[in-house]
Design a protein with these regions (language model features):
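Transition segment at domain starts
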Residues: 1-27
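Short, surface-exposed beta-strand/strand-loop-strand elements in extracellular ectodomains
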Residues: 40-60, 106-108
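Beta-sandwich interaction modules
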Residues: 19-28, 64-115
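Surface-exposed loop/edge segments in extracytoplasmic proteins
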Residues: 2-5, 52-65, 69
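Viral virion structural and adsorption modules
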Residues: 1-7, 45, 97, 101, ...
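Short glycine/proline-centered coil/turn motifs in the loop regions
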Residues: 37-39, 99
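A short beta-strand element within beta-rich, extracytoplasmic domains
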Residues: 27-37
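Residue-level recognition of well-ordered beta-strand positions that form the cores
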Residues: 34-36, 46, 95
Length: 115
């Protein structure tokens, strides 16, 4: 998967979530997550296995359940961090918990769909 970048802030009313990043659940491998903080921020990388595009059991975007990343480095973080997701969720995003700055998150997933 090509790297995908999303951001949230500055000037966002907190808490505020970034756009969602759809990961490739068919591909193996991990996903690297790089968060670049600018200014005063407190942020959390969140993951969800809910899928609004599921043809059988879709979950509305507003009803999705978001969980904090299993890596505590990117939970209530206040500085730039590098993390990885070893279990690939369907979606991830960055949540700006508080602050007046911004956070930019870039996600790159390794691996390809096995045949």
């Amino acid at each position: 998967m090509r790297p995908i970048t999303v951001s949230v802030g500055p000037g966002a009313t907190t808490p505020a979530g970034s756009g969602m990043v759809r990961l490739d659940t068919w591909a193996g491998g991990n996903a690297s997550v790089q968060c670049v903080a600018s200014g005063t921020v407190n942020y959390t990388v969140q993951t969800s296995n809910d899928d609004p595009n599921d043809p059988v059991s879709p979950v509305a975007v507003g009803s999705m359940t978001w969980s904090a990343s299993p890596d505590s480095l990117v939970v209530a973080a206040t500085a730039s961090q590098m993390s990885s997701l070893t279990s690939i969720p369907v979606f991830c995003r960055v949540l700006l918990n508080s602050g007046t700055g911004s956070v930019t998150m870039t996600v790159a997933q390794s691996g390809v769909v096995p045949y």
